[in-house]
Curated annotation (Swiss-Prot):
Extent of Basic and acidic residues compositional bias: 10-32
GO function terms (MF aspect): phosphatidylinositol-4-phosphate binding
Compartments where located: Golgi apparatus, Golgi stack membrane; Golgi apparatus, trans-Golgi network membrane
Membrane topology according to the record: Peripheral membrane protein
Pfam families hit by this protein: GPP34
Similarity-based family: Belongs to the GOLPH3/VPS74 family.
Domain of life: Eukaryota
InterPro entries named in the record: GPP34-like, GPP34-like_sf
UniProt name for this protein: Golgi phosphoprotein 3-like A
Gene that this sequence comes from: golph3l-a
Amino acid sequence: MTTLIRRGRRAEEGQERRADSEDSIKDKDEEESADSKDIRLTLMEEVLLLGLKDKEGYTSFWNDCISSGLRGGILIELFLRGRVVLEPATIRKKRLIDKKVLLKSDKLTGDVLLDETIKHMKATEPAETVQSWIELLTGETWNPFKLQYQLRNVRERIAKNLVEKGILTTEKQNFLLFDMTTHPVTNTTEKQRLVKKLQESLLERWVNDPHRMDKRTLSLLVLAHSSDVLENAFSSLSDEKYDMAMNRSKELLELDPDTEGMKPNACEMIWAVLSAFNKS
Protein backbone atom coordinates (compact mmCIF):
# COMPACT_ATOMS: atom_id res chain seq x y z
CA MET A 1 0.00 0.00 0.00
CA THR A 2 2.83 2.37 0.96
CA THR A 3 4.64 1.63 -2.31
CA LEU A 4 1.50 2.39 -4.31
CA ILE A 5 1.04 5.71 -2.49
CA ARG A 6 4.66 6.66 -3.15
CA ARG A 7 4.32 5.75 -6.82
CA GLY A 8 1.10 7.75 -7.00
CA ARG A 9 2.78 10.74 -5.42
CA ARG A 10 5.76 10.47 -7.77
CA ALA A 11 3.39 10.28 -10.73
CA GLU A 12 1.49 13.36 -9.50
CA GLU A 13 4.75 15.25 -8.95
CA GLY A 14 5.89 14.29 -12.44
CA GLN A 15 2.61 15.54 -13.92
CA GLU A 16 2.92 18.80 -11.98
CA ARG A 17 6.48 19.31 -13.22
CA ARG A 18 5.38 18.66 -16.80
CA ALA A 19 2.46 21.06 -16.39
CA ASP A 20 4.77 23.74 -14.95
CA SER A 21 7.19 23.15 -17.80
CA GLU A 22 4.40 23.43 -20.38
CA ASP A 23 3.14 26.64 -18.72
CA SER A 24 6.62 28.17 -18.79
CA ILE A 25 7.02 27.23 -22.45
CA LYS A 26 3.59 28.72 -23.21
CA ASP A 27 4.49 31.93 -21.35
CA LYS A 28 7.78 32.14 -23.23
CA ASP A 29 6.02 31.57 -26.54
CA GLU A 30 3.51 34.33 -25.74
CA GLU A 31 6.33 36.73 -24.86
CA GLU A 32 8.26 35.96 -28.01
CA SER A 33 5.23 35.88 -30.31
CA ALA A 34 5.07 39.67 -30.35
CA ASP A 35 8.43 39.77 -32.09
CA SER A 36 7.77 36.79 -34.35
CA LYS A 37 6.93 36.95 -38.03
CA ASP A 38 3.45 35.56 -37.25
CA ILE A 39 2.29 39.07 -36.33
CA ARG A 40 2.08 40.49 -39.77
CA LEU A 41 1.00 44.03 -38.95
CA THR A 42 1.85 46.37 -36.12
CA LEU A 43 -0.95 48.24 -34.36
CA MET A 44 0.12 51.43 -36.15
CA GLU A 45 -0.14 49.71 -39.53
CA GLU A 46 -3.59 48.35 -38.67
CA VAL A 47 -4.86 51.79 -37.59
CA LEU A 48 -3.56 53.46 -40.75
CA LEU A 49 -5.01 50.69 -42.93
CA LEU A 50 -8.42 51.22 -41.33
CA GLY A 51 -8.17 54.97 -41.95
CA LEU A 52 -7.08 54.80 -45.59
CA LYS A 53 -9.63 55.16 -48.38
CA ASP A 54 -9.17 52.01 -50.45
CA LYS A 55 -9.09 53.52 -53.95
CA GLU A 56 -7.90 57.03 -53.16
CA GLY A 57 -5.07 55.86 -50.89
CA TYR A 58 -5.14 58.64 -48.30
CA THR A 59 -6.86 59.35 -44.99
CA SER A 60 -9.65 61.90 -44.60
CA PHE A 61 -8.42 65.49 -44.74
CA TRP A 62 -10.73 66.24 -41.81
CA ASN A 63 -9.20 63.62 -39.52
CA ASP A 64 -6.94 65.42 -37.06
CA CYS A 65 -6.93 62.55 -34.53
CA ILE A 66 -5.01 59.85 -36.36
CA SER A 67 -1.56 61.38 -35.74
CA SER A 68 -1.85 61.12 -31.96
CA GLY A 69 -3.62 57.76 -32.30
CA LEU A 70 -0.63 56.32 -34.16
CA ARG A 71 1.71 57.54 -31.39
CA GLY A 72 -0.50 55.84 -28.82
CA GLY A 73 -0.18 52.70 -30.92
CA ILE A 74 3.60 52.92 -30.69
CA LEU A 75 3.44 52.96 -26.87
CA ILE A 76 1.06 49.98 -26.69
CA GLU A 77 3.11 48.06 -29.25
CA LEU A 78 6.27 48.61 -27.19
CA PHE A 79 4.41 47.45 -24.08
CA LEU A 80 3.11 44.28 -25.75
CA ARG A 81 6.63 43.53 -26.98
CA GLY A 82 8.03 43.82 -23.47
CA ARG A 83 10.08 46.97 -24.09
CA VAL A 84 8.30 49.36 -21.71
CA VAL A 85 6.24 49.21 -18.52
CA LEU A 86 4.41 51.69 -16.33
CA GLU A 87 5.97 52.51 -12.98
CA PRO A 88 4.32 50.81 -9.96
CA ALA A 89 1.47 52.64 -8.26
CA THR A 90 2.30 54.71 -5.19
CA ILE A 91 0.21 56.73 -2.74
CA ARG A 92 0.76 59.85 -4.85
CA LYS A 93 0.61 58.11 -8.22
CA LYS A 94 -2.40 55.84 -8.32
CA ARG A 95 -3.91 57.17 -11.53
CA LEU A 96 -2.65 55.83 -14.85
CA ILE A 97 -2.35 59.36 -16.20
CA ASP A 98 0.28 60.13 -13.53
CA LYS A 99 2.46 57.05 -14.00
CA LYS A 100 5.76 57.35 -15.86
CA VAL A 101 6.72 55.07 -18.74
CA LEU A 102 9.84 53.06 -17.86
CA LEU A 103 12.13 51.41 -20.38
CA LYS A 104 12.22 47.70 -19.53
CA SER A 105 14.47 46.61 -22.41
CA ASP A 106 16.37 48.63 -25.00
CA LYS A 107 16.58 45.66 -27.38
CA LEU A 108 15.64 46.94 -30.82
CA THR A 109 12.60 45.49 -32.58
CA GLY A 110 13.50 45.95 -36.24
CA ASP A 111 10.65 48.43 -36.73
CA VAL A 112 12.05 51.90 -37.43
CA LEU A 113 9.39 53.87 -35.53
CA LEU A 114 9.49 51.59 -32.48
CA ASP A 115 13.29 51.63 -32.39
CA GLU A 116 13.43 55.41 -32.76
CA THR A 117 11.06 55.73 -29.80
CA ILE A 118 13.16 53.32 -27.73
CA LYS A 119 16.24 55.48 -28.37
CA HIS A 120 14.34 58.63 -27.33
CA MET A 121 13.17 56.97 -24.11
CA LYS A 122 16.65 55.71 -23.33
CA ALA A 123 18.01 59.25 -23.59
CA THR A 124 15.20 60.85 -21.54
CA GLU A 125 15.69 61.65 -17.87
CA PRO A 126 13.45 61.92 -15.91
CA ALA A 127 10.90 59.55 -17.43
CA GLU A 128 7.70 60.92 -18.98
CA THR A 129 4.03 59.92 -18.65
CA VAL A 130 1.99 58.29 -21.42
CA GLN A 131 0.23 61.56 -22.23
CA SER A 132 3.56 63.43 -22.36
CA TRP A 133 5.07 60.85 -24.71
CA ILE A 134 2.11 61.05 -27.09
CA GLU A 135 2.49 64.84 -27.17
CA LEU A 136 6.28 64.68 -27.58
CA LEU A 137 6.18 62.09 -30.36
CA THR A 138 3.49 64.12 -32.14
CA GLY A 139 5.46 67.36 -31.75
CA GLU A 140 2.74 69.03 -29.68
CA THR A 141 5.04 70.66 -27.12
CA TRP A 142 5.86 74.25 -26.25
CA ASN A 143 9.33 73.28 -25.09
CA PRO A 144 11.76 73.90 -28.00
CA PHE A 145 14.32 71.58 -26.38
CA LYS A 146 11.89 68.67 -26.69
CA LEU A 147 11.02 69.09 -30.36
CA GLN A 148 13.79 66.58 -31.08
CA TYR A 149 11.46 63.82 -29.85
CA GLN A 150 8.94 64.38 -32.63
CA LEU A 151 8.59 61.42 -34.99
CA ARG A 152 8.39 62.84 -38.51
CA ASN A 153 6.59 61.54 -41.60
CA VAL A 154 4.96 58.80 -39.53
CA ARG A 155 2.05 58.08 -41.87
CA GLU A 156 4.30 57.94 -44.91
CA ARG A 157 6.76 55.61 -43.17
CA ILE A 158 3.98 53.29 -42.02
CA ALA A 159 2.48 53.32 -45.51
CA LYS A 160 5.86 52.34 -46.98
CA ASN A 161 5.95 49.37 -44.59
CA LEU A 162 2.53 48.33 -45.88
CA VAL A 163 3.76 48.71 -49.46
CA GLU A 164 6.70 46.42 -48.68
CA LYS A 165 4.26 43.90 -47.21
CA GLY A 166 2.21 43.92 -50.42
CA ILE A 167 -0.89 45.52 -48.92
CA LEU A 168 -0.62 49.00 -50.46
CA THR A 169 0.87 50.44 -53.62
CA THR A 170 2.33 53.90 -54.33
CA GLU A 171 0.85 56.39 -56.79
CA LYS A 172 1.03 60.11 -57.54
CA GLN A 173 -2.20 62.12 -57.70
CA ASN A 174 -2.64 65.70 -58.82
CA PHE A 175 -4.70 67.96 -56.56
CA LEU A 176 -5.04 71.21 -58.53
CA LEU A 177 -1.97 73.05 -57.24
CA PHE A 178 0.17 70.19 -56.01
CA ASP A 179 1.01 66.52 -56.46
CA MET A 180 0.51 64.12 -53.57
CA THR A 181 1.85 60.64 -52.98
CA THR A 182 -1.02 58.24 -52.28
CA HIS A 183 -1.15 54.59 -51.24
CA PRO A 184 -4.24 52.76 -52.56
CA VAL A 185 -5.08 49.37 -51.05
CA THR A 186 -4.09 46.47 -53.32
CA ASN A 187 -4.48 43.58 -50.87
CA THR A 188 -8.14 44.01 -49.96
CA THR A 189 -8.17 40.56 -48.35
CA GLU A 190 -5.89 41.75 -45.55
CA LYS A 191 -8.02 44.82 -44.86
CA GLN A 192 -11.20 42.74 -44.92
CA ARG A 193 -9.62 40.35 -42.41
CA LEU A 194 -8.88 43.30 -40.15
CA VAL A 195 -12.39 44.72 -40.47
CA LYS A 196 -13.92 41.29 -39.83
CA LYS A 197 -11.82 40.86 -36.68
CA LEU A 198 -13.12 44.13 -35.25
CA GLN A 199 -16.72 43.41 -36.24
CA GLU A 200 -16.68 39.93 -34.72
CA SER A 201 -15.10 41.18 -31.49
CA LEU A 202 -18.21 43.32 -30.92
CA LEU A 203 -20.80 40.98 -32.44
CA GLU A 204 -20.42 37.18 -32.76
CA ARG A 205 -17.48 36.96 -30.34
CA TRP A 206 -18.57 39.64 -27.90
CA VAL A 207 -17.53 38.60 -24.37
CA ASN A 208 -18.77 41.66 -22.45
CA ASP A 209 -15.50 41.77 -20.51
CA PRO A 210 -12.43 43.61 -21.88
CA HIS A 211 -10.09 41.46 -19.80
CA ARG A 212 -11.22 38.34 -21.64
CA MET A 213 -10.61 39.93 -25.02
CA ASP A 214 -7.48 39.39 -27.08
CA LYS A 215 -5.06 42.16 -26.05
CA ARG A 216 -4.23 43.22 -29.58
CA THR A 217 -7.92 43.37 -30.55
CA LEU A 218 -8.72 45.46 -27.47
CA SER A 219 -5.75 47.69 -28.30
CA LEU A 220 -6.98 48.16 -31.86
CA LEU A 221 -10.48 49.07 -30.67
CA VAL A 222 -9.07 51.73 -28.35
CA LEU A 223 -6.67 53.10 -30.97
CA ALA A 224 -9.19 53.03 -33.82
CA HIS A 225 -11.64 54.97 -31.65
CA SER A 226 -8.98 57.48 -30.59
CA SER A 227 -7.91 57.88 -34.24
CA ASP A 228 -11.52 58.40 -35.38
CA VAL A 229 -11.42 55.46 -37.79
CA LEU A 230 -13.47 52.88 -35.86
CA GLU A 231 -16.70 53.63 -37.73
CA ASN A 232 -14.92 52.78 -40.98
CA ALA A 233 -14.85 49.14 -39.85
CA PHE A 234 -18.63 49.08 -39.33
CA SER A 235 -19.78 50.74 -42.57
CA SER A 236 -20.57 47.41 -44.26
CA LEU A 237 -22.86 46.22 -41.45
CA SER A 238 -26.64 46.23 -41.53
CA ASP A 239 -28.30 49.01 -39.53
CA GLU A 240 -29.15 46.66 -36.67
CA LYS A 241 -25.63 45.23 -36.39
CA TYR A 242 -24.09 48.67 -36.86
CA ASP A 243 -26.06 50.04 -33.90
CA MET A 244 -25.15 47.01 -31.79
CA ALA A 245 -21.43 47.31 -32.59
CA MET A 246 -21.40 51.05 -31.92
CA ASN A 247 -23.28 50.68 -28.62
CA ARG A 248 -20.97 47.93 -27.41
CA SER A 249 -17.85 49.84 -28.40
CA LYS A 250 -19.21 52.92 -26.63
CA GLU A 251 -19.94 50.83 -23.53
CA LEU A 252 -16.38 49.45 -23.63
CA LEU A 253 -14.65 52.78 -24.23
CA GLU A 254 -16.61 54.57 -21.51
CA LEU A 255 -15.29 52.24 -18.79
CA ASP A 256 -13.10 53.95 -16.20
CA PRO A 257 -9.47 53.31 -17.26
CA ASP A 258 -8.10 53.55 -13.71
CA THR A 259 -10.58 50.98 -12.41
CA GLU A 260 -9.94 48.61 -15.32
CA GLY A 261 -6.17 49.06 -15.10
CA MET A 262 -6.16 47.80 -11.50
CA LYS A 263 -7.93 44.53 -12.26
CA PRO A 264 -6.00 41.21 -12.37
CA ASN A 265 -4.25 40.52 -15.69
CA ALA A 266 -5.14 43.99 -16.96
CA CYS A 267 -2.98 45.40 -19.74
CA GLU A 268 -2.17 48.70 -18.05
CA MET A 269 -0.76 50.46 -21.08
CA ILE A 270 -3.97 50.04 -23.10
CA TRP A 271 -5.97 51.72 -20.34
CA ALA A 272 -3.28 54.35 -19.79
CA VAL A 273 -3.43 55.33 -23.48
CA LEU A 274 -7.25 55.48 -23.34
CA SER A 275 -7.00 57.62 -20.20
CA ALA A 276 -4.55 59.97 -21.93
CA PHE A 277 -6.89 60.45 -24.89
CA ASN A 278 -9.85 60.99 -22.57
CA LYS A 279 -7.94 63.80 -20.86
CA SER A 280 -6.73 65.47 -24.06
